[in-house]
Amino acid sequence: MTQTATAPISPESRAERPRSHWDRVATAAEHQHWDAVASGVAEILAADVLERDRGNLDPTTELEPLRSSGLVNLLDPAEFGGGGAVWSTAFRVIRILAAADASLAQILLYHYVNSANIAFSAPESERERFYRATIEGRWLWGDSVNPVDPDLELTPRGDGFELNGLKRFSTGVSSGDAVLVNAVIATGDRAGETLTFVLPRDRAGIEPLGDWDFLGQRQSASGSVRFTGVRVDASEILGALVDEPFATLITPSIQLGFGNLYLGIAQGALAKGRGLTLGRKNSWFLSGVETYAQDPFVRRLYGELVAHTAAAEALADRVGALHDAEVARGAAVTAESRAAQAIEIAKVKIVTDALALDVTTRIYEATGSSSAKSAIGLDLYWRNVRTHSLHDPVDYKKLEVGANYLTGDVQPLSLYT
């Protein structure tokens, strides 16, 4: 995407701006444009996805299409050279990429959420410099945020801090350009406060350990990172974790991203299965038809899986539009409206989790025993969704939705709810 230089925003103009630049819902033209861009990138990624998965190495050059296409800056403000798109557009992009390469789709999803902390966490007066840096550098943002692994220590040092510790599941750090970190201040007047800050990936003392060796999402660069005496400058701090309703939309945003990731994996498995089924030139001897594509039981199975996938897509699209509208409310977002949106997103997560596991398992019933060959790689879809769907237990999403439906209860704010 072409980037053009723009003049800095004056303090007077800045004061009149909405809470974020995501102050509208997506247009059909926006969706169509970025769908096409994502489809082109997905085609590139699909060409060698199996070989890269088997290599089990963190991605490097294969991330370049995400940068050169403009996808890395899709959610950034247009006034600074970004794509100027809104969240539902980003979720559709993740869905399209996940159908081809769920690992790189995960890296991009986390990048979107990580870099969105500029809008959700940083003061308005500081956002422009962060956005200009990430847009001009086409940064990919990884993170060391995993809230169930609070093993980082942030110690005051002069005007800044020193970071030490180990953080597991640090998606994108080993392959990215910037590292988003949440850490609790250990000592001093601000002890106990959680800060959000962004560091350059090449900062001394940041050491990815290369220990990501899992069943699926093998190229998601989600290994552990050790921080040893890492300098954190005051200028690198985005802000402190707060319970302002608008700022806490960061968590529902990534949860809706997960739902679209799973939906995309299901769609990819269906498309792969269709090609395999149409390529089978014989049939089961009791079927009374010439090919498996004509077999009534195969057709029945596809009918069921396609219908369920279409229903999940409709739900994801509806909730994506609701999310655009909720984010666009900015400072008018309330605890109640935020909670209502989180419930809608939990519904998407529940449905797409079950759908993707079902589709990626049962597709073999339509493609037959020959499709179990390692060379075909149909297992990639199941391995990927089975791995990532364990990120946070979907049973607790069911609990959220059920409790809200019965008694109106909502879950307390956290980095998972």
Where are these regions (language model features)?
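Glycine-rich phosphate/cofactor-binding loops in nucleotide/flavin-utilizing enzymes
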Residues: E365-T417
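Glycine-rich beta->alpha junctions and the first turn(s) of the following alpha-helix
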Residues: F214-A310
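Generic structural signal for well-ordered, non-transmembrane alpha-helical segments
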Residues: S39, G264-Q267, A271, G303-A310, ...
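Amphipathic, small/basic residue-rich leader segments at the start of a protein or domain
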Residues: M1-L109
